[in-house]
A protein has these predicted regions:
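Hydrophobic faces of well-ordered beta-strands that scaffold small-molecule active sites
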Residues: 14-18, 45-47, 81-84, 148-152, ...
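Alpha-helical scaffolding within the catalytic cores
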Residues: 2-5, 28-35, 66-69, 137, ...
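Polysaccharide-binding and catalytic clefts of secreted carbohydrate-active enzymes
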Residues: 107-296
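Boundary/entry segment of secreted carbohydrate-active catalytic domains
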Residues: 7-29
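Aromatic-lined substrate-binding rim segments of carbohydrate-active enzymes
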Residues: 31-39, 43-112, 134-138, 235-246
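Short, solvent-exposed turn/loop segments enriched in Gly/Ser/Thr/Pro and often Arg
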Residues: 21-23, 48-51, 84-93, 148-157, ...
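Low-complexity, Gly/Pro
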Residues: 1, 7-10, 35, 81-83, ...
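Acidic (Asp/Glu)-rich catalytic clusters
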Residues: 5-11, 34-41, 71-76, 139-145, ...
Length: 298
């Protein structure tokens, strides 16, 4: 981003930060961890992006005590907190209540619970659940003196999760097409659906571009990708608006991924104060069978 707004100016300049997961460690370790961070010159600590199940262990029942203590421990060492929304990891109880949250792959199979990013950007159930947890976290910590800025979610689209082919996604895709083309004749002309007799009589006839005998219409596929990108932007905007309401003046960022082009980063970043990206010093070398001397160059 070239735009620098007043919120972003608050955190301009190089600062050393770290990701920290207090929920993973015995509380007896937190104070020493924070002291060592300070001694190493760390200024900012990112927390809570994967902690939904600890923040809300049961529907509507929040456990803030541990997170309050973790933030206070970091603040006692003069460390600024980067507070995250925990929406990259919907908990099991939420999936069991609303299985429509799970995304559907291009093979038509539902992608299951058990890792992360197991949600569909177009799921109404997940959109509302995300609003609720963002409201809860932002209202709790929006004015906390240790919270320097915010991060929405975590690495949108990682693990091929931008595009879903669910019924909910198809419904919203049809609405997106109506807004884009106005009437079905305009879509038929733009897509050139006269080819192979693929003309549509209404937007309701249009499905996801998968499962066809041979390759799906390229315009159909392209618009589905554009739609999916807009769904990411819509979802991020919802979170940003909630955070701004409860934490005005504090910068909001998202951690994008390098060389990832599955959605429009500029459109998503347009609602943020800071566009950040995740730097992995070793890249994916730990997953590759390179010789040690090759890895040493990195």
């Amino acid at each position: 981003m070239t735009r620098v707004n007043d919120n972003a100016k608050r955190i301009m300049g190089m600062r050393l930060g770290v990701c920290y997961y207090p929920e993973h460690w015995p509380e007896a370790m937190w104070k020493d961890d924070a002291a060592r961070m300070r001694s190493l010159g760390i200024k900012q600590v990112r927390i809570a992006e994967f902690a939904w199940s600890r923040i809300e262990p049961s529907p509507g029942e929040y456990d803030w005590d541990w997170l309050d203590r973790a933030i206070d421990t970091l603040a006692a060492e003069g460390l600024d907190v980067v507070m995250c929304t925990p929406t990259a990891t919907p908990p099991k109880w939420l999936i069991d209540r609303h299985p429509d949250i799970l995304p559907v792959g291009a093979d038509g199979h539902v992608r299951g619970f058990g890792s992360r990013r197991h949600y569909d950007f177009s799921s109404p159930s997940y959109y509302e659940a995300s609003k609720a947890i963002c409201e809860a976290v932002a209202s709790r910590y929006g004015q906390h003196p240790a919270v320097a800025y915010w991060q929405t979610d975590n690495e949108y689209g990682c693990h091929q999760t931008v595009v879903s082919y669910s019924a909910a996604a198809v419904t919203r895709f049809r609405e997106w097409l109506k807004a884009r083309y106005g009437d079905i004749d305009a879509l038929n002309r733009a897509w050139g659906t006269v080819f192979w007799s693929m003309e549509y009589r209404s937007f309701d006839e249009i499905d996801a571009p998968i499962g066809t005998v041979t390759e799906a219409h390229p315009s159909h596929r392209l618009d589905y990708r554009r739609f999916a990108s807009d769904e990411v932007a819509r979802y991020n905007r919802m979170q940003v608006e909630i955070i701004r309401k409860h934490s005005p003046g504090r910068p909001i960022a998202h951690n994008f991924m390098q060389l990832f082009t599955e959605f429009d980063h500029y459109k998503v970043a347009g609602d943020l104060d800071v566009a950040s990206w995740d730097s992995y010093p070793l890249g994916a070398l730990e997953e590759q069978w390179y010789e040690p001397e090759v890895k040493a160059k990195f």
